[in-house]
Amino acid sequence: MVASSQKILVTGGAGFIGTHTVVQLLNNGFNVSIIDNFDNSVMEAVERVREVVGSNLSQNLEFTLGDLRNKDDLEKLFSKSKFDAVIHFAGLKAVGESVENPRRYFDNNLVGTINLYEVMAKHNCKKMVFSSSATVYGQPEKIPCVEDFKLQAMNPYGRTKLFLEEIARDIQKAEPEWRIVLLRYFNPVGAHESGKLGEDPRGIPNNLMPYIQQVAVGRLPELNVYGHDYPTRDGSAIRDYIHVMDLADGHIAALRKLFTSENIGCTAYNLGTGRGSSVLEMVAAFEKASGKKIALKLCPRRPGDATEVYASTAKAEKELGWKAKYGVEEMCRDQWNWAKNNPWGYSGKP
């Protein structure tokens, strides 16, 4: 535990990665204020964070219901509290939905973030950890993905992340006192070991592990495997899956870097394990962890899906002193622990 009186604003802190990061911030002695509009999350998630950290630490957590697109919500928050840094998670993140409704994504992800920068600058809070994504690499020409690769998003969601990275670089270049870390996540999975926090998507899940989990608890009949003829070891696509608690610790490491490195500028880091697992390998690992058989439906490839993507983690290891600790076995164990305790997510009912 590191004592700290620093206060961190966490936008979208009621979401999957947000809640797990807030737990680690509180455990590391930070004071935390969450702002969230519950577009893709619920108040119960915030209550569970309080439960997980205990009554003492939960005194250091505040919550505000607000929307970054409404500048007044931010203005009230920054007028009331002095923030030392912002961790910015808030945003929509479903690739398919972004293709069908790009305007919603541009409004939510871009407008909200631009408002946030303006209010931060006005109140002289110029340190940010930004939640980016490996989607900014698009179809990488080679692997592993290294931070200085050419960036080329393939869909509106990915483009919002890419635009926001470019905006961050432009702001920092024009106003060098800003310190910004861009964290490019690969595929976050798993859950808090308590089984009280986890991913709870609305509707049909867009990501592999919540989908597998819903088949395991009987909410969905089978898993659609998109592509079984890729040139990989078992024909299914390969991705870099990372435990959400490793990801949360990556944010703590990034925050420490912001506070200690005057010359950080605007720097990007990959957060992954540096190892790829195929869809079918993840299914097998989950079956082993849960004792459940996952019914599969083999489907054609989805347009735009890459064959194999995984991270080079050398830069984060060297500059942030961070390295993923958990393997696929722990990811599936914790995912199943969350699923069996919360088959219907935070609502507890169909």
Swiss-Prot record:
SUPFAM superfamilies listed in its UniProt record: NAD(P)-binding Rossmann-fold domains
A biological process from GO: UDP-L-arabinose biosynthetic process
Active site: Y157
Temperature dependence: Optimum temperature is 30 degrees Celsius.
Control of this protein's activity: Inhibited by Hg(2+).
GO molecular function: UDP-arabinose 4-epimerase activity; UDP-glucose 4-epimerase activity
The keyword Transmembrane helix is assigned to this record: no
GO cellular component: cytosol
pH dependence (record): Optimum pH is 8.5-9.0.
Pathway(s) annotated for this protein in UniProt: Carbohydrate metabolism; galactose metabolism; Nucleotide-sugar biosynthesis; UDP-L-arabinose biosynthesis; UDP-L-arabinose from UDP-alpha-D-xylose: step 1/1; Cell wall biogenesis; cell wall polysaccharide biosynthesis
Top-level EC class: isomerase
Binding site for substrate: S133
Cofactor(s) this protein cannot do without: NAD(+)
Residue sites binding NAD(+) per the record: G15, F16, I17, D36, N37, F38, D39, N40, D67, L68, F89, K93, K161, Y185
Family: Belongs to the NAD(P)-dependent epimerase/dehydratase family.
Protein known as: Bifunctional UDP-glucose 4-epimerase and UDP-xylose 4-epimerase 1
The species this protein was found in: Pisum sativum
Gene designation per UniProt: UGE1
